[in-house]
Design a protein with these regions (language model features):
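Helix-turn-helix/homeodomain-like alpha-helical modules used for DNA recognition
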Residues: 3, 7, 93-108
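C-terminal flanking helix
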Residues: 72-79
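Short helix-to-turn junction characteristic of helix-turn-helix DNA-binding domains
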Residues: 43-46
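Residues within the DNA-recognition helix of helix-turn-helix
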Residues: 67-70
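Alpha-helical residues within the helix-turn-helix
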Residues: 55
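Helix-turn-helix DNA-binding motif, specifically the short coil turn and the N-cap/start of the second
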Residues: 49, 58-63
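Short alpha-helical "packing" element that flanks the helix-turn-helix/winged-helix DNA-binding module
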Residues: 36-40
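Short, Lys/Arg-enriched anionic-surface-contact patches
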Residues: 2-3, 8-34
C-alpha cells in the first residue's frame, strides 16, 4: 500500500484554470493539479532550482522532480495534441503569508 500523499504548499491559486485550443474536444481534457502548476510557475516562471522549489513547496527535491516531470509531460501533450488543459485539485495548502509561514514568492 502506498504512503499517503503529503500536503504541498502553494503560493496562490491560478487566475486562469482552463486553456482551450480553438478546435479542442473538451471531453478529452488533461488535468494539471495545483502542485504541478506551482512547480511550473516556480521553476519556469520564477527561475528557481529544484532544491529551491522543494523548499518553498515543503517537499523533498525528488518529489519536486517527479511533480515537475509529470507537469511538463501534461503540458507537452496538451500543446502537441491540441487538448484542453484544466488546472485544479491535488493535496495542497495555501501559503498563509504569515511571517512564520511566508515563502517570499507569494503571487499576491
Amino acid at each position: 500500500m502506498p504512503r499517503p500523499q503529503r500536503c504541498r504548499r502553494i503560493c496562490g491559486l491560478p487566475e486562469h484554470t482552463k486553456f482551450i485550443p480553438e478546435e479542442a474536444d473538451c471531453r478529452d481534457a488533461i488535468a494539471l493539479s495545483l502542485d504541478e502548476y506551482e512547480s511550473i510557475r516556480l521553476m519556469d516562471r520564477e527561475g528557481l532550482t529544484h532544491e529551491q522549489c522543494a523548499e518553498v513547496m515543503q517537499v523533498s527535491r525528488t518529489t519536486v522532480t517527479e511533480i515537475y516531470a509529470g507537469a511538463r509531460r501534461k503540458l507537452a501533450e496538451a500543446i502537441v495534441d491540441g487538448r484542453m488543459l484544466v488546472i485544479g485539485g491535488g493535496q495542497v495548502r495555501l501559503c498563509q503569508r504569515l511571517p512564520e509561514d511566508r515563502c517570499g514568492l507569494c503571487k499576491n
